[in-house]
Amino acid sequence: MATFEQGDVVRVPFPYTDRRTRQHRPALVISNGGIGEYAQFLWVVMITSAENRRWPDDHDIGSNYREVGLPAPSIIRPTKIATIESRDASPLGRIPRSLLRRVLETISRHLAL
């Protein structure tokens, strides 16, 4: 089983809140690696196409989207957090440390940390 770190971009079956289906899509690992007994879970936030309507706390991945393993310009959506099983994740790439820092600051602000 692959191990993951905070800042990794992965492909996961991301759950939808409005229906019972799942779609494989990219996500950003925000947990400090695997969590839970035997590190079997990851906390991730959604990555979506830059063509979608922007939400206030979205972060643009920018022109280096291919370097992080994404097929198209994309944004990170910290508002959409999920817990997934690490065995369901496939590695795609990593985001730059500066972008990860901004995403984590957004999440910390919402958690009042």
Regions found by a protein language model. Name each.
Residues 2, 65-113:
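C-terminal terminal-subdomain/extension
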Residues 4, 30-46, 93-98, 108-112:
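Short, charge-rich amphipathic segments
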Residues 15-19:
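Short, charged beta-turn/beta-strand-edge "cap" motif at the junction between a beta-strand
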Residues 20-24, 29-64:
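Compact nucleic-acid interaction/catalytic patches
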